[in-house]
């Protein structure tokens, strides 16, 4: 097997590759995709000290550019590759202005407790502050649940139950989009 740091770098490179290849299966051109390359479980530390670089825990790296090699365009964080909250915000602002999305879909912190997902949502909201482009709709979803890491459960092509509501004070509305084979 690989050494731990080498395995972590390989996993990151595979994720970068997936971020380009998987959308292509759906007909999304590479020029519309970007990999940010920030490190797993480091977003809370980045948020706590916005101008301080936060290196990878596993990959022995402190430069995000290794994982951006497939990007078709440069982002602000590519200037120094520093994994900081401020670079993340600058990257998000650049992507939002480039894509001008009408809809943004994010993990919802009330139903997805993963610390990186919570911080990613906070980063998008912070990046949107004062930005000349604003989406018309923001949707939330759960990738991880509070009590387990196995949701959504079930067989491929089966229906998926809605995630449980953990905070009754929130107004969460289900959204289901019908897909065709085309």
Segments (PLM) and residue ranges:
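Metal-dependent de-N-acetylase/amidase catalytic core
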Residues: 2-18, 25-30, 35, 39-182
């Amino acid at each position: 097997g690989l050494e731990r740091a080498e395995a972590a770098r390989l996993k990151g490179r595979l994720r970068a590759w997936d971020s380009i290849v998987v959308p292509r299966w759906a007909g999304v051109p590479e020029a519309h995709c970007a990999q940010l390359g920030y490190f797993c479980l480091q977003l809370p530390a980045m948020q706590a000290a916005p101008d301080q670089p936060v290196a990878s825990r596993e990959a022995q790296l402190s430069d995000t550019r290794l994982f951006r090699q497939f990007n078709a365009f440069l982002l602000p964080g590519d200037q120094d590759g520093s994994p900081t909250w401020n670079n993340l915000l600058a990257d998000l602002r650049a992507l939002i202005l480039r894509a001008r999305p009408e809809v943004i879909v994010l993990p919802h912190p009330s139903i997805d407790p993963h610390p990186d997902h919570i911080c990613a949502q906070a980063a998008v909201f912070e990046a949107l502050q004062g930005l000349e482009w604003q989406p018309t709709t923001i949707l939330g979803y759960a990738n991880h649940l509070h009590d387990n890491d196995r949701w959504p459960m079930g067989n491929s092509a089966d229906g998926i139950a809605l995630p449980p509501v953990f905070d009754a004070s929130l107004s969460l509305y289900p959204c289901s989009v019908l897909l065709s084979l085309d």
